[in-house]
């Protein structure tokens, strides 16, 4: 059985997917796990593969959801994306892709979308 934290995470990831689909993106995959990290959502925006990190913070005592994506997390995100692309016979060097962040506050309605977060 999932812990409450995992259930909440799954709920916010689902809300992020619905939000992005409402903006015209199409779903490719979710929760792709690699030794180096996980890709929360993989979406398609026309000809662009979009690797989406979903973050949620109900309290700002430890920083905001955006601030929680530190350098180390960014490196894991890039590494996982490169491994996923390799399975598709692509790489970060030749694929048309970007890295978007979906940041939630306390509720699914408190959402912020930052395209090209790693630009």
Curated annotation (Swiss-Prot):
Extract one GO molecular function annotation from the record: nucleic acid binding
- Write down the Pfam families for this protein, in alphabetical order: UPF0102
Superkingdom, according to UniProt? Bacteria
Q: Which InterPro entries match?
A: Restrct_endonuc-II-like, tRNA_endonuc-like_dom_sf, UPF0102_YraN-like
Record-stated family = Belongs to the UPF0102 family.
Task: Please identify the protein, giving its name as recorded.
Answer: UPF0102 protein CGSHiEE_03775
Q: What is the lineage of its organism?
A: Bacteria, Pseudomonadati, Pseudomonadota, Gammaproteobacteria, Pasteurellales
